[in-house]
Amino acid sequence: MNTISSTVTIFLFISVTATFFITPGVSKPSEDATLSITEFGIKYGHSVKEHDVVTEDGYILTLFHIPGKTKRSILLMHGILDSSDTFILRGNLSLIITLANKGYNVWAGNTRGNKYGRRHKYLDPDTDAEFWDFSFHETGYYDLAALVDFILVSTDEQSIRTIGHSQGTTANFVLLSSRPEYNEKIKGFIALAPATFLRNVRPPASNLAKEGPAINRFLKSLGIEELLGDQLAASELYKLLCSQRIFSYYLCFLSTVLPIVGIDPTRIEPEFWEVIIGHNPSGTSRKSIIHYFQLIFNKRFANYDYGPVENFRRYKSLIPPSYNLKQVTTNVSLFVGQNDPLVTVKDVDILRLMLPKDPKYHLMEPELWNHIDFIWANDMDVYLYPYIFSSLQDFE
């Protein structure tokens, strides 16, 4: 339990220190820290439409649409604890605005459990624990499938292209391997930091994964199923402590976030950190976090591990089945950062060997490029976008 104790100690240190140094309300938040994705679009020259998409199992997800003029539809899928907002936070430099300016028909999806996915036809996320009984498996098998089908019906297109970051890539690989008919509906998939095999994850995330079973028991004993939801008190406190003055940038970002995602202090400046905190974290389920811990600890890209007895009941096997990546026959482009401790070059090399069609592969040139630089770096237009557009052209 040493890792848990250390985490609690760090959080208490942040709370006490920030309370001493920070006076709430002194720092006026950046405008972009408070804008909705619709307001972002208007500010940067594009209209944004909102749609409700209902999954097969009753979850209601918000799908944002930035209409394009000349090119095909692209669906963007965010990472864990994130939302569709992530792709527009950089304004004119963001992926959404960049694609829209190029004429693409842009769709930004959300998964169950984040701030745009806390609705269900029958379940109440505040009172029904069943609402939170999901991991990234369901985000791929149900959520992504529903979003893709909605876009195809809405546009009368035969297929779309997808771009995923982190968990957004996991969802794509789950869908394409579990429901192979979607390989015809997704004709090209760009995977930014593809999170599948996580055998070589580095500390501190690897240390947390070792404590995964203990963390899981601890959370379940407290009845905690939703983690870091947008409206939860813990998230509100975190956003308050980490959005005030430049002091919080050094304490919350440089000292706490960067060790997890990769030390690269030059691509996220203090002013933009304030924008990030205004929109993140956005919530997920306990089970989603634990499923990733299982990938790290068990060193397999596999279904959720419920334990031998429940596994046998669900899967007819004592261990959860691996996802059959040989079923992924669509065109795939893999992007990996040399300084990403979560999705490492070694693990992406394993993924490359598992795919039946040789994927396009791009190792990011800056040596310090990390896990979150794919969505928030201040030089994405130089080091990332040219290769994204090259992949999209190959998908035509």
Regions found by a protein language model. Give the residues of each.
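Cleavable N-terminal signal peptides of Sec/SRP-targeted secreted and luminal proteins
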Residues: 3-27
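N-terminal cap/lid segment of alpha/beta-hydrolase-fold proteins
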Residues: 37-67
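Short, surface-exposed "cap/lid" segments of acyl-processing enzymes
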Residues: 55, 66-121
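Alpha/beta-hydrolase active-site loop
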Residues: 130-152
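Alpha/beta-hydrolase-fold enzymes
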Residues: 153-158, 169-313
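Short beta-strand/loop motif that positions the catalytic acidic residue
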Residues: 328, 334-336, 340
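Conserved alpha/beta-hydrolase "acid-adjacent" motif
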Residues: 341-347
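Catalytic active-site module of serine/aspartate enzymes centered on a nucleophile-bearing elbow/loop
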Residues: 362-396
